[in-house]
């Protein structure tokens, strides 16, 4: 009986807590650093939303940050190719399939988000990084699904 009452109570609670596990927040600052070196979501997430908050004060032209995701084997090549893609393309090669997800480039005090599907990404070796020229060596981390 106690179990039935507990289940009944739990069924009246608002949206499942699991939904929050599929939404992540990361910060970038004027010292060219993210506040996280690893991000992860459970395999039950069919979509993930990543929000980037730029906690610095410098403008996007001087200390812009974004959040981009690729396979670890590809991220350096993607970041290097992005330098010639320019600011209009968020310093990412346009329509490049190696870019699995990305936000726009933002400056101090701004925020941006990206939502992407996780189909086929569980268990893969993924890296998130900032594609602003020169940032990817320091502003990077691992991204795990599952």
Model-derived regions: residue spans:
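Short amphipathic, basic-aromatic surface patches that mediate peripheral association
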Residues: 52-57
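N-terminal edge beta-strand
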Residues: 21-47
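Positively charged n-region of N-terminal signal peptides that target proteins for export
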Residues: 1-4
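Cleavable N-terminal signal peptides
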Residues: 6-7, 17
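Extracytoplasmic/periplasmic copper-protein system
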Residues: 20-29, 73-92, 133-146
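Extracellular/periplasmic metallocenter environments
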Residues: 101-146
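Beta-strand signatures of extracellular beta-sandwich domains
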Residues: 66-70, 129
């Amino acid at each position: 009986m106690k179990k039935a009452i507990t289940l009944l109570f739990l069924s009246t609670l608002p949206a499942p807590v699991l939904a929050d596990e599929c939404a992540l927040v990361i910060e970038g600052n004027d010292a060219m650093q993210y506040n996280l070196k690893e991000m992860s979501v459970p395999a039950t997430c069919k979509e993930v939303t990543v929000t980037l908050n730029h906690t610095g004060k410098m403008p996007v032209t001087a200390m812009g940050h974004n959040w981009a995701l690729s396979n670890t084997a590809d991220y350096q090549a993607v970041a290097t190719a992005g330098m010639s893609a320019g600011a209009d393309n968020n310093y990412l090669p346009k329509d490049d399939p190696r870019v699995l997800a990305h936000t726009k480039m933002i400056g101090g005090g701004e925020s941006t988000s990206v939502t992407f599907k996780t189909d086929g990404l569980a268990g893969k070796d993924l890296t998130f990084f900032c594609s602003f020229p020169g940032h990817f060596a320091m502003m990077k981390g691992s991204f795990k699904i599952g």
